[in-house]
Swiss-Prot record:
It holds the Pfam family Cation_efflux. Residues 11-21 have a biased composition (Basic and acidic residues). GO terms for biological process: intracellular zinc ion homeostasis; response to nematode. It comes from Arabidopsis thaliana (Mouse-ear cress). This is Metal tolerance protein C2.
Amino acid sequence: MERSISFNPRGDNELPDDRSSDVGYAANDRRLAYSRSFQQSHGPRTPAVTEAAKPFLDRTVSSIDMPPDIYSVDGSDVFFGEGKDVDMAKVSVLEMVWEVFGVVTSGNRQMKRLFLLIALNVLYSTTELSIGIFTGRVGLVSDAFHLTFGCGLLTFSLFAMATSRKKPDHAYSYGYKRLEVLSAFTNALFLMFMSFSLAVEALHAFIQDESEHKHYLIVSAVTNLLVNLLGVWFFRNYARVNIAYRKAEDMNYHSVCLHVISDSIRSAGLILASWLLSLGVENAEVLCLGLVSVTVFMLVMPLFKATGGVLLQMAPPNIPSSALSKCLRQITSREDVTEVLQARFWEVVPGHTVGSLRLQVKSGIDERPLLQYVYDVYHDLGVQDLTLQTDYT
């Protein structure tokens, strides 16, 4: 017989965190949920359509009292106490944008600063694109498209900041915090691509022996540098290569800061190359573009690895593997535990670690002391949500 238990020793009326505070008691709380499977003595056969063929444990005859409005009883798709008047399919894109704009205007200082930075970049890129089209200068048009794409990524970061404030629902039971991790990963991926493109541009300049800068590109680089330096000052608290991420928004803020820093380095590289060319230094453009490419790559790689690890549900980096192994040895050493069959731990977002453990225990034991012990062991490591499955020998 198997039993799967999501265990928490706190009182029944105390929620583990704020993820269920808006949906009522036990809306997405699995502490008291369990499932059983029985080994049948007979072989496989075609089930008969009779009353006796119904499952031994049936949801319709469950003795667990569920609060109203948590599960639908009329076949509709309304769950977790959302109310039947909510229809997400009818929400228009304009209403969603307006809602996000309202959250931004009433949000924290970082969100308002990012909104101002995006507005400045949009104004500058639009002006640069217009001048490039009317004057026929392809360099300005190309740089304007680069800035526009960067504005799109910053807008996605702002959207993630606003949306992550939404409370969990039936579709996203863990909430929307991971959207900020996805936004940070997208920014890091874009910067990695920018580093690669700069390296290709440097190689092309070396092969073609192009060593001439146009003055209007220098003016564009100086203006872009000034705008990005304002963004660096806005997010100066995250102007580091390695950061201990304690929350999902730390990753997002860090990615925004690295985005504007990388753009600033790119603009500074163009200005430096033009100055060196004016001094008669050969291959100055190749040298500067190569240095910028390597610098951006080294800046972004730690963020790229951290966000990718969270999205791939890697083992939590804040918990040493030796500590997890020690906990497994402590659990296995108990007399009522035969074997630890499976142990999985990962981060939903930075600061929220979950785990799943499958234990083989001796039949006829009292599970409560064992569950309490296992919970205490992993809770001390920082595992917030722990699901246990027990198999009897």
